[in-house]
Design a protein with these regions (language model features):
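Short, aromatic/His-centered strand-loop micro-motif at the edge of beta-sheets
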Residues: 142-163
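Flexible glycan-contacting loops in extracellular carbohydrate-active proteins
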Residues: 187-212
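Extracellular glycan-recognition surfaces and repeat-rich motifs
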Residues: 39-69
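Beta-strand-rich interaction surfaces with strong enrichment in secreted/lumenal proteins
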Residues: 79-86, 150-156, 200
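Bacterial N-terminal signal peptides that target proteins for export
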Residues: 1-7
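Short tryptophan-centered beta-strand motifs in secreted/extracellular beta-sheet-rich domains
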Residues: 35, 95, 160-170, 175-177
Length: 218
């Protein structure tokens, strides 16, 4: 535990300045990355499929290929980038994302949270058209991913940038997902299976650029 706390402090110290606590939850800011100095704070499942590059004068970190060398033991997303040295139970995560290629109904990005190990974690699949395996909050618990929601709200992907927010309260069990509208969640659920764990971004099998990641939590 002391090692995790030390690594978290190192991760925070490498990005400055840090803003105040989240105004809604009073959680402290524990991580921030605009990728201007690289991507050393991220652990990815397949380094060959992630690229740090400049887009319109701005540095981003993104997925460059739909195919991936990572083959999860339980059916779940292939493209995963986890923040190094930071674990939280309760958190607010925000970031900007751009979908690079229109792949149809399951065009997506994913957010991973309360990640215990490669076979136990939550994630949200922000798929364009919801069904049982797209556009839902999922759980992977030593078995293929399973939807915890029955969301019917589509995700309006386009060629531009979008803002995503994930809010987790582990004591209440609540999970809320926001897309562009930061006041009204596009989907939500309650579950207490997993507590403190890692946080990440990525996709099931699509190409995305990510920027301006901020994580408040404890």
């Amino acid at each position: 535990m002391k090692i995790h706390r030390l690594l978290a402090c190192i991760a925070v110290a490498s990005f400055s300045p840090l803003s105040a606590a989240d105004p809604e939850t009073d959680l402290p800011l524990v991580f921030s990355d605009d990728f201007e100095k690289g991507h050393a704070s991220w652990e990815v499942t397949d380094p060959a499929t992630w690229t740090h590059r400049e887009v319109d004068g701005n540095k981003v970190f993104g997925i460059n290929s739909r195919t991936n060398g990572y083959k999860p033991e339980a059916r779940s997303p292939h493209h995963i980038a986890l923040i190094k040295g930071v674990e939280v139970a309760d958190f607010v995560l925000t970031f900007r994302v751009r979908s690079i290629k229109d792949t149809g109904a399951h065009r997506d990005c994913c957010v991973f949270f309360n990640h215990q190990d490669p076979k136990r974690f939550y994630y949200v699949h922000l798929g364009a058209k919801p069904d049982s395996s797209s556009g839902q909050i999922m759980i992977v618990n030593n078995a293929p991913r399973k939807a915890m929601t029955a969301n019917e709200n589509p995700i309006p992907w386009g060629d531009g940038w979008h803002l995503v927010k994930v809010v987790r309260d582990s004591k209440k069990g609540t999970i809320e997902i926001f897309f562009d509208d930061m006041e009204k969640p596009v989907m939500s659920t309650e579950d207490k299976t997993f507590g403190k764990g890692r946080i990440g971004i990525g996709s099931f099998d699509d190409r995305n650029d990510f920027d301006d990641v901020k994580l408040w939590g404890r």
